[in-house]
Amino acid sequence: MRDPDALLVRAGVRGDPERDQHFLIDDRVLDRLPGYLPDSADTDHVLEIGGGTGALTDRLLDVADRVTVIERDPGLATFLTDEFADEIEAGSLTVIEGDALEVPLPDFTASVSNLPYGVSSEIAFRLLPEKRPLVLMFQQEFAERMAAEPGTDEYGRLSVTAGHYADVEVVEPVPKEAFSPPPAVESAVVRTTPREPPYEVPDDELFMRLVRAVFTQRRKTMRNAVRNTTHISGIEDAEAVVEAAGEDLMSKRAGNVPPEAFARLAAIAAEVDG
């Protein structure tokens, strides 16, 4: 495996917190990341977002038939193309220079990525609907919120929306010292295993809007949150929805409402509004 410190030297970069660049340099963490994919994961075509200097890329090439890297930094994309010229020529690696939020995604079978933290939420929710196994590095606080259960302080919109697409687990905390330069916060690795949600919703978009709406007023009862956020949820007759949903659900606060109850509320809203 290529040495991550040597890759930094060859690339001539040091990382730049102002540009959200923190390179993962801990060999042990790098070696473990591909192994966090579920046993059932298809590694025919693994997507990496934010290839950096290629330390993780190198390890993914060892377990995948093909790897595609999306790297937005032109200098690093050029470095990856030069550093892995043999792998590119052999057809096992493709390097795409561009923003992972804008470029078309390849037809990947799994993704393992150390995401740029500034856009990690946006990238995660571009990947999750693809229903592929994911192993992603996040800020620890974000990771814990993503995997949180109802009734906990961390539970929120992020927990419900991520859990709509997959089972979510925090599989490893990662200290600041694993990166160069060290970020200001601790990190964590999240594994998502895709599955259908254990409930039905009439419309994914309505479900997501409703969840987003009520969590903007998480300290209020669901009754008041539904009434006060129709400009976000798009619900036309909030009073009828509140009445149809019943006292048991409407007296709770969003942080104590499980995903299946949000699904039931979305179904009620769809029926009431026609």
From Swiss-Prot:
One of its GO terms (cellular component) is cytoplasm. Its EC number is 2.1.1.-. Coiled coil: none annotated. Keywords: Cytoplasm, Methyltransferase, RNA-binding, rRNA processing, S-adenosyl-L-methionine, Transferase. The gene is rsmA. InterPro entries: KsgA/Erm (IPR001737), rRNA_Ade_diMease-like_C (IPR023165), rRNA_Ade_Mease_Trfase_CS (IPR020596), rRNA_Ade_methylase_Trfase_N (IPR020598), rRNA_adenine_dimethylase (IPR011530), SAM-dependent_MTases_sf (IPR029063). It comes from Natronomonas pharaonis (strain ATCC 35678 / DSM 2160 / CIP 103997 / JCM 8858 / NBRC 14720 / NCIMB 2260 / Gabara) (Halobacterium pharaonis). It is found in: Cytoplasm. It comes from the Archaea. The lineage of its organism: Archaea, Methanobacteriati, Methanobacteriota, Stenosarchaea group, Halobacteria. One of its GO terms (molecular function) is rRNA (adenine-N6,N6-)-dimethyltransferase activity. Its main location: cytoplasm. Specifically dimethylates two adjacent adenosines in the loop of a conserved hairpin near the 3'-end of 16S rRNA in the 30S particle. May play a critical role in biogenesis of 30S subunits. Signal peptide: none annotated. S-adenosyl-L-methionine binds at residues 22, 24, 50, 71, 99, 114. This is Probable ribosomal RNA small subunit methyltransferase A. Belongs to the class I-like SAM-binding methyltransferase superfamily. rRNA adenine N(6)-methyltransferase family. RsmA subfamily.
